[in-house]
Amino acid sequence: MEKHITTPITQEITKDLKSGDYVYITGEMYVARDAAHKRMIEALDRKEELPIDIKDSTIYYMGPSPARDGRPIGSAGPTTATRMDKYAPRLLDLGEKAMIGKGKRSKEVIDAVIRNKAVYFAAVGGAGALLSKCIKSSEVICYDDLGAEAIRKIYVEDFPVIVVIDSEGNNLYETSIKEF
């Protein structure tokens, strides 16, 4: 099924998303990879506040290439989600509602998705130039010393993703194997 949603992505939205749904997202989301995730968890361990508003947030696992003239961002394809698996459950428990990446997730992440009624989306790997056309603005908001791995806030219009793991734990990577 095809659905259009806007951020922030709340539990009201995630409960209606099913594994295998094609979804187009419009709104603000964060961009962060493993180095930024590690810093956020280290900040939490020191009892510091996160540098982003995690409640009902969407984090896209991506490291952009430099922007061309007149564009907000360069190629913007997803990175492998498993690199964030050791950090994601804690952020989900704090209110993150959606993750976008590519590839499988650990049992701990899937359990946290179910527990928090969140969702894991996949974006098409190898299509970073096309995906970047959906990104209308991009701003580094923290950890700028990390370069391409700094946390960004982006605004997207009709950003295409597929629900891989829905809020009930249904996993497209498992069900599609059985189907085909």
What kind of feature is each model-predicted range?
Residues V31-A32, A36-F159:
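Feature captures the catalytic cores and cofactor-binding loops of soluble hydro-lyases/lyases
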